[in-house]
Amino acid sequence: MFGFEISAHCANTAARCGCFHTPHGPVHTPRFMPVGTLATVKGISTDQLARTGAQMVLSNTYHLHLQPGEEIVAAAGGLHGFMGWDGPMLTDSGGFQVFSLGDLNKIDDRGVVFRNPRDGRIIDMTPEHATQIQMALGADVAMAFDQCPPYPATENDVIDACRRTHAWLARCVEAHSRDNQALFGIVQGGCFPHLRRESARAVADFDLPGIAVGGVSVGEPVEEMHRIVRDVTPLLPTHKPRYLMGIGTLREMAVAVANGIDLFDCVLPTRLGRHGTALVGGERWNLRNARFRHDHTPLDPSCPCPTCSGGHTRAYLNHLIRSEELLGLTLLSLHNITHLLRFTTAMSQAIRDGCFSEDFAPWEPDSPAHHTW
């Protein structure tokens, strides 16, 4: 039911392309996953999302538990039936959101007690509870409940977070009983190399269908994130998908793929779209800018997204954004998601063609790799 096949390797880097098989279809890697936190990629219908080339979509356990509740989602046949998406799905455990968004009352080895920001009620979230919620949501992949330490954090605090993460992973494994759902573990360790290595080995020992690297893009310097990926990835099983959580910029994805990462997720493309910004050729264009007001050319003539292929011009998008029309935000979000998906697809093709190290590793904003995607 679940499996990961590697079809090509880069001769000069650790980059590889492959296919992660799930009950709802294949995920060709390397691959960016759009984020649909509340069972929707903001402002985009599932039909529109399918036209971007998206294969796997991410939703969030924390937010869906608070609204509408996993019971309602389960009654609709799980997330797939609830949102009308028939492709693969992944649910984050909500651990990051509990620690970053929740009003924490207590954290101990048992779990986390926090106050619901919506109605003030107290919620007791344990690894078992997080796993039960994800089984009810029914995504193809569930993430283990972990403790993501902030940046910066003391070494002792990160040691405690790693210890809890590994103990909680064992409890998630024990609680997980859904055969048609894969459970992934998460590597933590902050910016301490020895703790990252210890966590990578500890999580790998559970022999789960896939492994994620978490605790990055939380405020650390980007060079530190690159070092974490370089240190951790060689310690992970080669025959399983590797997922770098919360990353969605072109350079960071290219660096990660060069080090053997397969999957990514990030809210960046839709967040930028909602603020009137388009991703074009490695740049960020503010479509509110007056220079687009009389520009009647497509946003990106080479882009097959519904926005560009649909004949929507820069001038029209400028008008929509300036007028605060919701359609403008949708069109830019569709384009931005397609842009990141095209980029990961181009990396996959470059690996197969034997030119990844020339085109993408290391990738820089003025790289000649631009013409390949």
From Swiss-Prot:
Question: Which residues lie within the region annotated RNA binding?
Answer: 246-252, 270-274
Q: What is this protein called?
A: Queuine tRNA-ribosyltransferase
State any GO BP term from the record: tRNA-guanine transglycosylation
Organism for this UniProt entry: Parasynechococcus marenigrum (strain WH8102)
Tell me the pathway: tRNA modification; tRNA-queuosine biosynthesis
The record, for NCBIfam families, names: Q_tRNA_tgt (TIGR00430), tgt_general (TIGR00449)
State the reactions this protein catalyses.
Answer: 7-aminomethyl-7-carbaguanine + guanosine(34) in tRNA = 7-aminomethyl-7-carbaguanosine(34) in tRNA + guanine
Q: What is its EC number?
A: 2.4.2.29
